[in-house]
Amino acid sequence: MWDVIAARGFERDTYFSRAVTEIRALPKLEGTVHVNIALVLKFMPSYLGAAHGGAQHYPEIPVRQDDDDDSYLFHQGPAKGLSSIGFADWRPAFDRFAHLPNVAIFREQIDAFTELVLTAPPTDTQQKDLDYLQVLGQLFAQIVYGQLILESAALAIDNGETRPGSVSDLSDLTEPHLDRIFAVFVRDMADQAVQLHGQASATEEQSAAVLGIVRKPRINAEAEHTFVTEVLSYSGTYEMKS
């Protein structure tokens, strides 16, 4: 919201003047960014390795809307042993939607990122370079988010588990929506790759390998017009509950 509220919003709606402090404070509740990224990177070897013979087998998780006690989420222990956690193969989530142009391009970016990590991993010096690790972690996080989105999409589109009436209602989700979402992912991955390429501590091998991630999303003019028209049709339709 902070990024999209124009100056006129502050002039016409005094609520924003009061809300800006809370809007910008919300990310702080999630913790310090560089600490979280450092923790995320501990998962990276096991996560990427799951597609290369190191996969663990876990049961599929369906949509949960039952009245169960999830209080364990608020009683998390210390962040120890993260690098030893195993993951299932992430490829099936992407294979299901591989026919969508931008999902396919994003998958190419993942392969290029994996090649970068395997052939030119962070050096001992870079392990202490927060600027380098921040960008590397952002690249990795995009992959994980992409998998989660596609897994939820498959539950909705294939199994009809759309969670109607919830904040995660996916009743109207279509494959064109997914393709448009991943157009953003492709662009963001490319942006982060360029940043990593320009890092002062990046080796020549890393700078060359990371350029393999730079891709351009495929935007169909007719599909884009349909998407924008749909987005604009939602303007003014939201009604706050009294």
PLM feature spans:
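Flavin-dependent oxidoreductase catalytic core characteristic
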Residues: 1-242
